[in-house]
C-alpha cells in the first residue's frame, strides 16, 4: 500500500478545513480544533482512514475491478486526469453528466458516437465532406471528448468511485449509492462523512492536498494490479487444462462410433 506520512499531509495542507461557521457537526470526531476561525482536521484520525481507503482501492484493482476517478472542480481537474491515466483508470474531470451511472446505456451510446467521430477523422470520411460539415462534426467530437473522453474505454459500470469533493460531486455520489457502488472520498469539515463508504477527512481545495490524494489512489491501483498477475496465470493454467481435456473428448465419443457402425450394416 502507498505510504503517506502525517508530515507529508501537513506539508500539503491536508489539515486545513473550512471556516468554523460552515462546519458539519458530523465531522466533529475528526476536528482537532480551530485556528483563526478555520477548523483544523485531526490528522491522527485521517491517517488510518486514508490507509483503509487506499487498501480498498488496491483490493478493487487486484480483482481486475475499475475505479472511476472523479474531480470536476478547477483545482482537481488536471491532477485527476494525470493520475487516472497513469494508473489506467477512467476519469471525469470536466462536468458530471446526470445519469452517467444510472442511465449508463444511454451514455454508452454517446461514447459510441464519440468513437465514430474519431474514426471519421482518421479513415478519410471527413475528407469527403464540405468544410462547414467537417467543422460541425469536429465541434461535436470536441464536446463529447471533453465530457466523456475519460470514460470512453469504460465498458461497464465502475466497481468503485474515488471522489475529491463530495459537495461538488453530490449527484454522482447519489447515483453511486443508488446502484450500490462504493464511494471513496475526501470529506472536508463542511460535509457529512456518512454519505460515503470510505471517508478521508481532509482539505478538498488545496492543489497540493488534491495531488497527494490522487497520487496515492493511483499508486494503490498500480499496486493492486501488480498483485493480480499470479491469480490470472493460475486461471490461465486452469483454462489450458480444461481446453486440453476438451480436445481429447471427441476422439472417445461412443455415439459417433455407433452411428458409423449402423451405416455399415445398412450398406451390407
From Swiss-Prot:
Disulfide bonds: none
This protein's UniProt keywords: Ribonucleoprotein, Ribosomal protein
Gene3D superfamilies for the chain: Glucose-6-phosphate isomerase like protein, domain 1, Helix hairpin bin
Ranges where the record places region Disordered: 233-268
BP GO terms, sorted: translation
SUPFAM superfamilies, A to Z: Ribosomal protein S2
Domain of life: Bacteria
Single Gene Ontology MF annotation: structural constituent of ribosome
One Gene Ontology cellular component: cytosolic small ribosomal subunit
InterPro entries with a match to the protein in the record: Ribosomal_uS2, Ribosomal_uS2_bac/mit/plastid, Ribosomal_uS2_CS, Ribosomal_uS2_flav_dom_sf
Family membership: Belongs to the universal ribosomal protein uS2 family.
Protein's name according to its UniProt entry: Small ribosomal subunit protein uS2
